[in-house]
Amino acid sequence: MGGRLWMRRGLWMLLILVLAAAYWLLPIQGGVLVIPGEAPDSPHWPVVRLSPASPEPGQTVDLWVTDVEAFPYVKLVVDGVSYEPVAWPSTVDDTLIWRWRFAVPEKGARRVTLYHDCHKGCVVWKRVDLQGDYQSPSIDRVPTKLGVVFANPDRDWHGRSGWVVDLTYARLAGEAYWGVEDLTGRVYQANAKGLRVLVRVDYDQGQSMPPVGDEEAVTEYLAYLRRLARDDRLRGVYGYILGSSYNSVDSNAQAEGVPVTPAWYGRVFSGYGEGVSRTDNAIQIVRAENPSVRVLVGSVRPWSLDADGVHKHTIDAPWLNYMNSLVGVLDESAKAKATAGIPLAAPDGFAVHASGRPEAPELAGRSASDEPRLDLPREEWKGAQAGFRVYQDWLDIINAYPSTQGLPVYITTANTYISGEGIPPSQNYPAGWLTTALEVIDEEPQVHALCWFIDDFPHDTQWDQFSLTQRAGLMDEAANEFDALLGP
Protein backbone atom coordinates (compact mmCIF):
# COMPACT_ATOMS: atom_id res chain seq x y z
CA MET A 1 0.00 0.00 0.00
CA GLY A 2 2.72 2.43 1.02
CA GLY A 3 4.70 1.60 -2.15
CA ARG A 4 1.74 2.38 -4.42
CA LEU A 5 1.21 5.72 -2.60
CA TRP A 6 4.80 6.76 -3.19
CA MET A 7 4.53 5.65 -6.83
CA ARG A 8 1.45 7.87 -7.35
CA ARG A 9 3.25 10.79 -5.71
CA GLY A 10 6.26 10.18 -7.94
CA LEU A 11 4.08 10.22 -11.06
CA TRP A 12 2.52 13.52 -9.97
CA MET A 13 5.97 15.03 -9.40
CA LEU A 14 7.11 13.84 -12.84
CA LEU A 15 4.00 15.38 -14.42
CA ILE A 16 4.68 18.73 -12.72
CA LEU A 17 8.26 18.73 -13.98
CA VAL A 18 7.13 17.93 -17.54
CA LEU A 19 4.55 20.73 -17.46
CA ALA A 20 7.14 23.18 -16.11
CA ALA A 21 9.57 22.22 -18.87
CA ALA A 22 6.83 22.57 -21.47
CA TYR A 23 6.02 26.04 -20.18
CA TRP A 24 9.60 27.21 -20.67
CA LEU A 25 9.67 25.70 -24.16
CA LEU A 26 6.65 27.73 -25.26
CA PRO A 27 7.54 30.59 -27.66
CA ILE A 28 7.65 33.96 -25.86
CA GLN A 29 8.29 37.46 -27.07
CA GLY A 30 11.95 38.25 -26.62
CA GLY A 31 14.68 35.82 -25.76
CA VAL A 32 16.40 34.37 -22.74
CA LEU A 33 20.20 34.47 -22.73
CA VAL A 34 21.54 31.02 -21.85
CA ILE A 35 25.09 30.56 -20.62
CA PRO A 36 26.65 27.49 -22.35
CA GLY A 37 27.42 24.67 -19.95
CA GLU A 38 24.98 25.79 -17.23
CA ALA A 39 22.55 23.15 -15.98
CA PRO A 40 18.88 24.13 -16.56
CA ASP A 41 18.02 23.60 -12.90
CA SER A 42 20.91 25.83 -11.76
CA PRO A 43 20.51 29.18 -13.57
CA HIS A 44 23.40 31.55 -13.85
CA TRP A 45 22.00 34.65 -12.18
CA PRO A 46 21.03 37.13 -13.37
CA VAL A 47 18.85 35.85 -16.21
CA VAL A 48 18.30 38.45 -18.94
CA ARG A 49 15.48 38.58 -21.50
CA LEU A 50 15.29 40.95 -24.47
CA SER A 51 12.37 42.02 -26.60
CA PRO A 52 12.99 41.93 -29.50
CA ALA A 53 15.53 39.16 -29.01
CA SER A 54 17.91 40.42 -31.72
CA PRO A 55 17.33 44.17 -31.92
CA GLU A 56 18.45 46.27 -34.85
CA PRO A 57 20.12 49.70 -34.64
CA GLY A 58 17.58 52.36 -33.72
CA GLN A 59 15.03 49.91 -32.29
CA THR A 60 13.53 50.36 -28.84
CA VAL A 61 14.32 47.42 -26.59
CA ASP A 62 12.75 46.14 -23.39
CA LEU A 63 15.20 44.30 -21.16
CA TRP A 64 14.16 42.25 -18.15
CA VAL A 65 16.59 41.09 -15.47
CA THR A 66 15.72 38.34 -13.03
CA ASP A 67 17.85 37.63 -9.97
CA VAL A 68 17.57 36.11 -6.52
CA GLU A 69 19.47 38.92 -4.81
CA ALA A 70 18.00 42.37 -4.24
CA PHE A 71 20.90 44.44 -5.53
CA PRO A 72 20.62 48.18 -4.78
CA TYR A 73 21.46 51.17 -6.98
CA VAL A 74 21.31 49.34 -10.29
CA LYS A 75 22.00 50.87 -13.72
CA LEU A 76 22.04 49.88 -17.36
CA VAL A 77 24.71 51.50 -19.56
CA VAL A 78 24.42 51.61 -23.34
CA ASP A 79 27.15 53.28 -25.38
CA GLY A 80 28.26 55.32 -22.37
CA VAL A 81 24.71 56.46 -21.46
CA SER A 82 23.20 55.36 -18.13
CA TYR A 83 19.56 54.28 -17.78
CA GLU A 84 17.50 53.78 -14.63
CA PRO A 85 14.94 50.95 -14.49
CA VAL A 86 11.41 51.73 -15.66
CA ALA A 87 10.05 48.95 -13.44
CA TRP A 88 11.48 47.83 -10.13
CA PRO A 89 11.41 44.37 -8.53
CA SER A 90 8.33 42.66 -7.20
CA THR A 91 8.88 39.33 -5.44
CA VAL A 92 7.77 36.30 -7.49
CA ASP A 93 8.77 32.85 -6.27
CA ASP A 94 11.81 34.23 -4.42
CA THR A 95 13.07 36.00 -7.54
CA LEU A 96 13.25 39.70 -8.36
CA ILE A 97 12.62 41.33 -11.72
CA TRP A 98 13.80 44.68 -13.09
CA ARG A 99 12.87 46.16 -16.46
CA TRP A 100 14.67 48.71 -18.63
CA ARG A 101 13.74 50.36 -21.90
CA PHE A 102 16.33 51.88 -24.23
CA ALA A 103 17.08 52.53 -27.88
CA VAL A 104 19.86 50.62 -29.62
CA PRO A 105 22.47 53.13 -30.83
CA GLU A 106 22.56 53.73 -34.57
CA LYS A 107 26.33 53.57 -34.28
CA GLY A 108 28.58 52.51 -31.46
CA ALA A 109 28.74 49.60 -29.06
CA ARG A 110 26.49 46.56 -29.50
CA ARG A 111 26.97 45.52 -25.90
CA VAL A 112 25.07 46.74 -22.84
CA THR A 113 26.26 46.43 -19.27
CA LEU A 114 24.25 46.05 -16.08
CA TYR A 115 25.66 47.36 -12.81
CA HIS A 116 24.77 47.27 -9.14
CA ASP A 117 25.88 49.15 -6.00
CA CYS A 118 26.57 52.28 -8.04
CA HIS A 119 26.37 54.51 -4.95
CA LYS A 120 29.75 53.09 -3.94
CA GLY A 121 31.22 52.62 -7.44
CA CYS A 122 29.40 50.57 -10.08
CA VAL A 123 30.16 46.82 -10.01
CA VAL A 124 29.47 44.71 -13.11
CA TRP A 125 26.32 42.65 -12.78
CA LYS A 126 26.07 41.31 -16.35
CA ARG A 127 27.25 42.18 -19.85
CA VAL A 128 24.84 41.46 -22.69
CA ASP A 129 25.69 41.25 -26.39
CA LEU A 130 22.80 42.58 -28.46
CA GLN A 131 23.80 40.68 -31.61
CA GLY A 132 26.35 37.90 -31.79
CA ASP A 133 29.70 37.88 -30.04
CA TYR A 134 30.88 41.33 -29.01
CA GLN A 135 34.34 42.40 -30.11
CA SER A 136 35.98 45.49 -28.72
CA PRO A 137 36.46 48.12 -31.43
CA SER A 138 40.01 48.41 -32.69
CA ILE A 139 41.46 51.87 -32.10
CA ASP A 140 44.65 52.25 -34.11
CA ARG A 141 45.97 55.73 -33.37
CA VAL A 142 49.40 57.33 -33.35
CA PRO A 143 50.36 58.61 -29.88
CA THR A 144 51.07 62.27 -29.26
CA LYS A 145 52.06 64.17 -26.13
CA LEU A 146 49.61 66.91 -27.06
CA GLY A 147 46.43 67.21 -25.03
CA VAL A 148 43.81 69.53 -23.58
CA VAL A 149 41.93 70.28 -20.40
CA PHE A 150 38.14 69.87 -20.78
CA ALA A 151 38.08 68.37 -24.26
CA ASN A 152 35.48 69.42 -26.79
CA PRO A 153 33.62 66.14 -27.50
CA ASP A 154 33.43 67.12 -31.18
CA ARG A 155 37.15 67.74 -31.58
CA ASP A 156 38.85 66.03 -34.51
CA TRP A 157 42.01 64.38 -33.20
CA HIS A 158 43.18 63.50 -36.72
CA GLY A 159 43.85 59.89 -35.81
CA ARG A 160 46.09 60.79 -32.86
CA SER A 161 45.95 59.34 -29.38
CA GLY A 162 46.28 62.45 -27.27
CA TRP A 163 45.55 63.45 -23.68
CA VAL A 164 42.50 64.79 -21.89
CA VAL A 165 42.45 66.27 -18.39
CA ASP A 166 39.10 66.28 -16.59
CA LEU A 167 37.96 67.34 -13.12
CA THR A 168 35.59 66.09 -10.43
CA TYR A 169 34.83 67.13 -6.84
CA ALA A 170 34.31 64.82 -3.87
CA ARG A 171 31.68 67.10 -2.35
CA LEU A 172 29.78 67.38 -5.64
CA ALA A 173 29.63 63.64 -6.35
CA GLY A 174 25.92 63.72 -7.13
CA GLU A 175 25.84 67.00 -9.03
CA ALA A 176 25.54 67.60 -12.75
CA TYR A 177 28.78 67.79 -14.76
CA TRP A 178 31.19 67.67 -11.78
CA GLY A 179 29.79 64.45 -10.32
CA VAL A 180 30.29 60.78 -11.12
CA GLU A 181 27.55 60.24 -13.70
CA ASP A 182 28.57 62.97 -16.14
CA LEU A 183 32.25 62.17 -15.60
CA THR A 184 31.72 58.56 -16.68
CA GLY A 185 30.10 59.75 -19.90
CA ARG A 186 33.02 62.04 -20.74
CA VAL A 187 35.56 59.32 -19.98
CA TYR A 188 33.66 56.90 -22.23
CA GLN A 189 33.63 59.42 -25.10
CA ALA A 190 37.36 60.08 -24.74
CA ASN A 191 38.26 56.39 -24.54
CA ALA A 192 36.16 55.69 -27.64
CA LYS A 193 38.42 58.12 -29.51
CA GLY A 194 41.57 56.43 -28.22
CA LEU A 195 42.46 59.28 -25.84
CA ARG A 196 44.24 58.92 -22.51
CA VAL A 197 42.26 60.47 -19.67
CA LEU A 198 43.70 62.04 -16.54
CA VAL A 199 41.07 62.90 -13.91
CA ARG A 200 41.89 65.53 -11.32
CA VAL A 201 40.08 64.87 -8.05
CA ASP A 202 39.54 67.92 -5.83
CA TYR A 203 37.82 67.99 -2.46
CA ASP A 204 35.48 70.89 -3.29
CA GLN A 205 35.23 73.99 -5.40
CA GLY A 206 37.66 76.52 -3.96
CA GLN A 207 39.25 73.85 -1.73
CA SER A 208 41.50 71.59 -3.75
CA MET A 209 42.54 69.21 -0.94
CA PRO A 210 40.89 68.52 2.43
CA PRO A 211 41.66 71.44 4.81
CA VAL A 212 44.66 70.98 7.07
CA GLY A 213 43.78 68.94 10.16
CA ASP A 214 40.24 68.09 9.05
CA GLU A 215 40.13 64.30 9.32
CA GLU A 216 36.40 64.19 8.53
CA ALA A 217 37.15 65.89 5.22
CA VAL A 218 39.94 63.37 4.59
CA THR A 219 37.52 60.49 5.20
CA GLU A 220 35.04 62.00 2.72
CA TYR A 221 37.75 62.60 0.12
CA LEU A 222 39.16 59.08 0.44
CA ALA A 223 35.69 57.55 0.20
CA TYR A 224 35.18 59.38 -3.08
CA LEU A 225 38.52 58.18 -4.41
CA ARG A 226 37.53 54.63 -3.48
CA ARG A 227 34.25 55.05 -5.33
CA LEU A 228 35.98 56.32 -8.47
CA ALA A 229 38.62 53.59 -8.41
CA ARG A 230 36.01 50.87 -7.91
CA ASP A 231 33.61 52.06 -10.62
CA ASP A 232 33.89 49.77 -13.65
CA ARG A 233 32.71 52.59 -15.94
CA LEU A 234 35.91 54.47 -15.10
CA ARG A 235 38.33 51.62 -15.84
CA GLY A 236 39.49 53.61 -18.85
CA VAL A 237 40.95 56.38 -16.69
CA TYR A 238 44.71 56.54 -17.21
CA GLY A 239 45.45 58.23 -13.90
CA TYR A 240 43.97 60.19 -11.01
CA ILE A 241 45.55 63.53 -10.09
CA LEU A 242 45.16 64.49 -6.44
CA GLY A 243 44.45 68.21 -6.22
CA SER A 244 46.06 71.24 -7.84
CA SER A 245 47.59 74.56 -6.74
CA TYR A 246 47.06 73.63 -3.08
CA ASN A 247 50.07 75.78 -2.15
CA SER A 248 48.07 78.92 -3.00
CA VAL A 249 45.58 80.81 -0.84
CA ASP A 250 42.81 80.81 -3.45
CA SER A 251 42.77 76.98 -3.50
CA ASN A 252 42.10 76.84 0.25
CA ALA A 253 38.89 78.85 0.63
CA GLN A 254 37.46 76.58 3.36
CA ALA A 255 40.63 76.79 5.43
CA GLU A 256 40.57 80.58 5.91
CA GLY A 257 43.21 80.91 3.24
CA VAL A 258 45.72 78.64 4.99
CA PRO A 259 47.48 76.59 2.27
CA VAL A 260 47.87 72.86 2.56
CA THR A 261 51.31 72.01 3.94
CA PRO A 262 53.58 69.42 2.30
CA ALA A 263 53.20 67.24 5.40
CA TRP A 264 49.40 67.36 5.23
CA TYR A 265 49.38 66.57 1.53
CA GLY A 266 51.64 63.60 2.32
CA ARG A 267 49.25 62.43 5.02
CA VAL A 268 46.33 62.39 2.54
CA PHE A 269 48.36 60.94 -0.33
CA SER A 270 50.28 58.13 1.37
CA GLY A 271 49.73 58.30 5.13
CA TYR A 272 52.77 60.41 6.02
CA GLY A 273 53.03 60.98 9.76
CA GLU A 274 50.66 58.13 10.59
CA GLY A 275 51.45 54.54 11.54
CA VAL A 276 52.85 52.60 8.58
CA SER A 277 50.21 49.89 9.00
CA ARG A 278 47.36 52.34 8.43
CA THR A 279 45.74 52.16 5.01
CA ASP A 280 43.49 55.23 5.15
CA ASN A 281 45.38 57.12 2.48
CA ALA A 282 44.79 57.79 -1.18
CA ILE A 283 47.40 55.61 -2.81
CA GLN A 284 46.64 52.45 -0.83
CA ILE A 285 42.88 52.86 -1.25
CA VAL A 286 43.10 53.38 -5.00
CA ARG A 287 45.57 50.50 -5.46
CA ALA A 288 43.28 48.16 -3.50
CA GLU A 289 40.33 48.95 -5.77
CA ASN A 290 42.09 49.35 -9.13
CA PRO A 291 45.74 48.25 -9.22
CA SER A 292 46.22 49.31 -12.84
CA VAL A 293 45.30 53.00 -12.61
CA ARG A 294 48.01 55.56 -11.89
CA VAL A 295 47.97 57.81 -8.83
CA LEU A 296 49.60 61.17 -9.56
CA VAL A 297 50.73 64.01 -7.34
CA GLY A 298 48.76 67.17 -8.09
CA SER A 299 50.57 70.22 -9.43
CA VAL A 300 52.18 72.88 -7.27
CA ARG A 301 51.47 76.39 -8.54
CA PRO A 302 54.69 78.03 -9.77
CA TRP A 303 55.60 81.57 -8.73
CA SER A 304 53.18 81.55 -5.79
CA LEU A 305 54.49 83.23 -2.65
CA ASP A 306 51.64 82.00 -0.44
CA ALA A 307 53.47 78.99 1.00
CA ASP A 308 57.09 77.97 1.52
CA GLY A 309 58.77 74.71 2.44
CA VAL A 310 60.98 73.77 5.36
CA HIS A 311 63.42 71.88 3.13
CA LYS A 312 65.08 74.47 0.95
CA HIS A 313 65.80 73.74 -2.68
CA THR A 314 69.15 74.67 -4.19
CA ILE A 315 67.24 77.61 -5.68
CA ASP A 316 65.64 79.30 -2.69
CA ALA A 317 62.23 80.26 -4.08
CA PRO A 318 59.01 79.57 -2.09
CA TRP A 319 57.29 77.38 -4.72
CA LEU A 320 60.46 75.35 -5.29
CA ASN A 321 61.05 74.97 -1.55
CA TYR A 322 57.46 73.79 -1.22
CA MET A 323 57.88 71.27 -4.02
CA ASN A 324 61.17 70.06 -2.57
CA SER A 325 59.56 69.58 0.85
CA LEU A 326 56.58 67.81 -0.69
CA VAL A 327 58.64 65.33 -2.71
CA GLY A 328 60.83 64.73 0.34
CA VAL A 329 57.75 63.89 2.41
CA LEU A 330 56.43 61.48 -0.22
CA ASP A 331 59.84 59.83 -0.54
CA GLU A 332 60.11 59.41 3.23
CA SER A 333 56.62 57.93 3.42
CA ALA A 334 57.27 55.46 0.59
CA LYS A 335 60.53 54.30 2.17
CA ALA A 336 58.87 53.82 5.57
CA LYS A 337 56.12 51.71 4.02
CA ALA A 338 58.66 49.67 2.03
CA THR A 339 60.71 48.99 5.16
CA ALA A 340 57.54 47.65 6.80
CA GLY A 341 56.96 45.33 3.85
CA ILE A 342 54.32 47.50 2.16
CA PRO A 343 55.35 48.12 -1.47
CA LEU A 344 53.96 50.45 -4.12
CA ALA A 345 53.40 53.42 -1.79
CA ALA A 346 55.32 55.88 -3.97
CA PRO A 347 53.44 58.01 -6.51
CA ASP A 348 53.21 56.93 -10.14
CA GLY A 349 54.08 60.38 -11.44
CA PHE A 350 53.54 64.11 -11.12
CA ALA A 351 51.21 66.63 -12.70
CA VAL A 352 52.88 70.03 -13.12
CA HIS A 353 52.03 73.54 -14.31
CA ALA A 354 54.26 75.11 -16.96
CA SER A 355 52.92 78.38 -18.34
CA GLY A 356 54.77 80.48 -20.86
CA ARG A 357 55.75 84.10 -20.25
CA PRO A 358 55.97 85.60 -23.77
CA GLU A 359 56.37 89.14 -22.42
CA ALA A 360 59.16 88.35 -19.94
CA PRO A 361 61.88 91.03 -19.85
CA GLU A 362 64.44 88.21 -19.74
CA LEU A 363 63.67 87.50 -23.40
CA ALA A 364 65.72 90.62 -24.16
CA GLY A 365 64.44 91.01 -27.69
CA ARG A 366 64.38 87.32 -28.59
CA SER A 367 61.29 85.94 -30.31
CA ALA A 368 58.34 85.29 -28.00
CA SER A 369 57.52 82.15 -30.00
CA ASP A 370 60.88 80.71 -28.91
CA GLU A 371 60.12 81.27 -25.22
CA PRO A 372 59.55 77.54 -24.42
CA ARG A 373 63.14 76.64 -25.40
CA LEU A 374 64.80 79.60 -23.64
CA ASP A 375 66.05 79.63 -20.06
CA LEU A 376 64.62 82.67 -18.28
CA PRO A 377 66.29 82.73 -14.84
CA ARG A 378 64.94 85.64 -12.80
CA GLU A 379 67.43 87.38 -10.59
CA GLU A 380 64.92 88.40 -7.92
CA TRP A 381 63.95 84.72 -7.63
CA LYS A 382 67.57 83.63 -7.20
CA GLY A 383 67.70 82.10 -10.65
CA ALA A 384 64.36 80.26 -10.69
CA GLN A 385 62.86 79.86 -14.15
CA ALA A 386 60.33 82.59 -14.96
CA GLY A 387 58.61 80.92 -17.93
CA PHE A 388 57.71 77.61 -19.55
CA ARG A 389 60.99 76.01 -18.57
CA VAL A 390 59.88 75.98 -14.95
CA TYR A 391 59.17 72.34 -15.83
CA GLN A 392 62.96 71.85 -15.63
CA ASP A 393 62.92 73.10 -12.04
CA TRP A 394 60.19 70.57 -11.26
CA LEU A 395 62.18 67.75 -12.91
CA ASP A 396 65.31 68.63 -10.93
CA ILE A 397 63.41 68.24 -7.66
CA ILE A 398 61.56 65.05 -8.63
CA ASN A 399 64.79 63.39 -9.78
CA ALA A 400 66.63 64.25 -6.56
CA TYR A 401 64.82 61.60 -4.48
CA PRO A 402 65.22 57.80 -4.80
CA SER A 403 61.53 56.84 -4.88
CA THR A 404 60.54 59.53 -7.40
CA GLN A 405 63.60 59.69 -9.63
CA GLY A 406 62.63 59.26 -13.27
CA LEU A 407 58.88 59.14 -12.65
CA PRO A 408 56.66 60.40 -15.49
CA VAL A 409 55.70 64.05 -15.50
CA TYR A 410 52.51 65.38 -17.09
CA ILE A 411 52.16 69.07 -17.92
CA THR A 412 48.46 69.42 -17.19
CA THR A 413 48.26 73.20 -17.49
CA ALA A 414 50.08 75.02 -20.26
CA ASN A 415 49.24 78.33 -21.92
CA THR A 416 50.59 81.87 -21.96
CA TYR A 417 48.68 83.18 -18.93
CA ILE A 418 50.54 84.16 -15.77
CA SER A 419 48.48 84.46 -12.59
CA GLY A 420 48.88 87.97 -11.21
CA GLU A 421 49.67 89.57 -14.55
CA GLY A 422 46.14 89.11 -15.84
CA ILE A 423 46.80 88.93 -19.59
CA PRO A 424 44.85 86.04 -21.16
CA PRO A 425 46.14 84.03 -24.13
CA SER A 426 43.59 85.73 -26.38
CA GLN A 427 45.68 88.89 -25.98
CA ASN A 428 49.27 87.67 -25.73
CA TYR A 429 49.58 84.35 -27.60
CA PRO A 430 52.55 84.54 -30.00
CA ALA A 431 52.17 82.49 -33.18
CA GLY A 432 54.39 79.42 -33.04
CA TRP A 433 54.59 79.21 -29.23
CA LEU A 434 52.69 75.91 -28.97
CA THR A 435 54.71 74.40 -31.81
CA THR A 436 57.93 75.26 -30.00
CA ALA A 437 56.60 73.95 -26.68
CA LEU A 438 55.72 70.59 -28.25
CA GLU A 439 59.11 70.35 -29.97
CA VAL A 440 60.79 70.92 -26.60
CA ILE A 441 58.63 68.37 -24.76
CA ASP A 442 59.01 65.78 -27.51
CA GLU A 443 62.72 65.82 -26.65
CA GLU A 444 62.00 65.13 -22.95
CA PRO A 445 61.40 61.38 -22.43
CA GLN A 446 60.35 61.91 -18.82
CA VAL A 447 57.55 64.33 -19.78
CA HIS A 448 54.62 62.37 -21.18
CA ALA A 449 51.99 65.04 -21.84
CA LEU A 450 51.60 68.70 -22.78
CA CYS A 451 48.01 69.81 -22.19
CA TRP A 452 46.65 73.21 -23.17
CA PHE A 453 44.29 74.88 -20.72
CA ILE A 454 41.56 74.86 -21.99
CA ASP A 455 39.77 73.37 -24.98
CA ASP A 456 36.12 74.07 -24.20
CA PHE A 457 33.92 74.77 -21.18
CA PRO A 458 30.42 75.64 -22.42
CA HIS A 459 28.86 76.03 -18.96
CA ASP A 460 30.01 79.63 -18.49
CA THR A 461 32.15 82.25 -20.22
CA GLN A 462 34.99 82.78 -17.72
CA TRP A 463 37.44 80.69 -19.77
CA ASP A 464 36.49 81.89 -23.25
CA GLN A 465 39.75 83.86 -23.54
CA PHE A 466 41.70 80.61 -23.04
CA SER A 467 39.56 78.32 -25.20
CA LEU A 468 40.74 76.58 -28.36
CA THR A 469 37.10 76.06 -29.31
CA GLN A 470 35.88 79.64 -28.79
CA ARG A 471 38.86 81.12 -30.71
CA ALA A 472 38.68 84.56 -29.10
CA GLY A 473 41.30 87.01 -30.38
CA LEU A 474 44.73 85.43 -30.72
CA MET A 475 43.30 82.08 -29.63
CA ASP A 476 42.28 81.62 -33.26
CA GLU A 477 45.98 81.33 -34.09
CA ALA A 478 46.55 78.89 -31.21
CA ALA A 479 43.58 76.75 -32.29
CA ASN A 480 44.81 76.51 -35.87
CA GLU A 481 48.26 75.60 -34.61
CA PHE A 482 46.89 72.89 -32.32
CA ASP A 483 45.02 71.29 -35.23
CA ALA A 484 48.08 71.48 -37.47
CA LEU A 485 50.23 69.78 -34.82
CA LEU A 486 47.80 66.86 -34.68
CA GLY A 487 48.20 66.37 -38.41
CA PRO A 488 46.07 66.46 -41.57
Language-model region placement:
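Short proline/glycine-enriched turn/loop motifs at strand-loop junctions of beta-rich domains
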Residues: 67-73
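N-terminal substrate-binding region of glycoside hydrolase catalytic domains
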Residues: 132-264, 297-303, 310-318, 373, ...
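Edge beta-strands of extracellular beta-sandwich domains
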Residues: 121-133
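Aromatic sugar-binding surface patches on proteins
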Residues: 91-101
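Noncatalytic carbohydrate-binding groove/subsite architecture in carbohydrate-active enzymes
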Residues: 195, 200-201, 218-222, 262-428, ...
